[in-house]
């Protein structure tokens, strides 16, 4: 059945992610997050271009980690004679939103994040949502200029170390662990730095 094949695919993707994570010495979630693996198991991308249509996979991640995943998916599709959904081949990556581009450009110019939020009519936490999406899709950004301005260096190191040693990048878990000492915003800011440096 379809759902059984999708489950098998998901398990094979997870195993591969685990192998890569050991080999590259990065946490599994840095390679691809669970929702990305689930999307791969339902749409079966078999080229790097198609892989970039998967939520949370940008050009950077596709190039870095994608090759072994698409080979695995290709094998699975052939072995199980799976009909792949057509729409995946049609969609393109061209719809990267103007907002993302403008955020990346402003960060490159070291504009303060609260100012970027204001310019784009966003709440600060909405801006962080956007930046997280940018980083998860494999684009490297450097917000050190802002972090060093608003946080103490040892606080940054403390949160960074937490993510380095953690099994998950889950925000709720981090807040539970660190929330007594740090605000949610501080934790999210350092998590962005961590993901950008580790994953990209």
Q: Where are the predicted features?
A:
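Generic detector of short, aliphatic-rich beta-strand segments that form the cores of beta-sheets
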Residues: 9-10, 69, 187
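Helix-hairpin-helix
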Residues: 14, 21-69, 96-99, 123-128, ...
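Intrinsically disordered, low-complexity glycine/proline-rich and charged
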Residues: 60-86
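C-terminal non-catalytic scaffold/interaction domains in large multidomain proteins
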Residues: 77-172, 176-200
